[in-house]
Structure formats: C-alpha cells, structure tokens
C-alpha cells in the first residue's frame, strides 16, 4: 500500500500522513502497536491483588486467542511470512511493535507471580514464550494454513482452559 492510498483511505493529504509517520515502516509499527494495545492492553498484565492466578491467565489467554484468530491478524501473519523472505526487516518491525511488547508484559506478570509464591518460574521470559505458544498451538497453525477456521465459542474456551491448566501444572509451587 502506498502512502497515497493511506492518505486517501484516511481522507487526509499525503503531507498530513507524513507529518505523523515518516515512512511506511513507522505507520505499520504504529498500526500494530495500536491493535495490540486494544486487544492486549498493558493493564491486562498487571496482576490484581488477591486474584486467582488461573483467572488472570485465562483472561490473557482469551484475549490473545481472540487477537490471533481475528481475520486481520491471520491476514497480517500470512503477509509477514510471505514478505519475510523478501525483506526480513518487515518481520523485525512487526516483532518489535507487537509480540515483543506482549512478551515483556507477560514476563513481568509471571515474574511477579513467582515473587508472590503463586508459581515457580525460573525464567519468566521463557515461560511467557511457552504460554503464548501453547495458546497458539495446532489450531492457529491450521488456521494460518487455511485448513480450519478460527476457534470460537465453547471450542475456544475449552482450548484456553486446557492451555492454562497445562501451564499451571508445569509451573505450580
């Protein structure tokens, strides 16, 4: 997409777009950050005092599952995979704008859960990576390949509950 097309879609001049975003990469990163912030706000990774750890993890898993299953996220994932071989910086921009921020939030939450004695986690970053990989799992792989639709309703809820159960059993005190 050209900056002309972005300006036309936004109903502003190209100069206005460039005054906010110096190039397409900056615009792309801003869009990814905004989407992640809406679906997985920073507040989601702040551990509410006295909340059961499984409920906190379920809330995060539900939001993440909804994000990765959205039509926009599926299209973006496919685009990044296709463009990555042509321009690796495209994937790097995406990672910095979205997944890295989400991982940092989850890492901090898990570090806090460990310090409170709620879970036993030696490496919170690695545990955060495992958590999100479990949520994605085979259903996301099938979705990206076009072999299946997104998990919805009871099926999505059963999936995230199973993931959280596995995660808690792996890291219980």
Regions of interest found by a model, annotated:
Residues 5, 51-56, 123-126:
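A conserved beta-strand->loop->alpha-helix hinge within the catalytic CA
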Residues 29-60, 68, 72, 111:
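Amphipathic alpha-helical linker/stalk segments
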Residues 59, 63, 100, 104, ...:
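C-terminal peripheral helix-coil segments that are non-catalytic and often amphipathic
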Residues 55, 66-67, 71, 75, ...:
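Amphipathic alpha-helical packing segments from all-alpha helical-bundle domains
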Residues 24, 31, 35-36, 60, ...:
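Hydrophobic/aromatic residues within well-ordered alpha-helical segments
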Residues 32-35, 39-43, 72, 88, ...:
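Short amphipathic alpha-helical interaction/hinge segments
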Residues 1-26, 30-31:
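Helix-turn-helix
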Residues 23-28, 38, 90, 94:
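Short amphipathic alpha-helical segment with a characteristic S/N-K-E followed by hydrophobic residues
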């Amino acid at each position: 997409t050209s900056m002309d097309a972005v300006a036309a879609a936004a109903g502003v001049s190209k100069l206005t777009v460039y005054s906010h975003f110096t190039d397409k990469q900056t615009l792309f990163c801003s869009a990814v950050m905004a989407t992640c912030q809406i679906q997985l706000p920073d507040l989601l990774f702040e551990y509410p005092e006295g909340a059961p750890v499984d409920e906190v993890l379920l809330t995060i898993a539900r939001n993440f599952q909804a994000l990765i299953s959205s039509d926009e996220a599926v299209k973006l994932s496919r685009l990044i995979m296709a463009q990555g071989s042509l321009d690796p910086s495209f994937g790097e921009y995406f990672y910095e704008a979205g997944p890295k921020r989400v991982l940092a939030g989850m890492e901090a939450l898990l570090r806090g859960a460990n310090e409170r004695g709620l879970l036993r986690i030696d490496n919170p970053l690695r545990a955060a990576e495992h958590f999100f990989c479990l949520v994605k799992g085979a259903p996301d792989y099938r979705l990206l390949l076009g072999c299946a639709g997104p998990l919805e309703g009871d099926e999505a809820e059963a999936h995230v509950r199973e993931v959280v159960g596995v995660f808690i059993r792996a890291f219980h005190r």
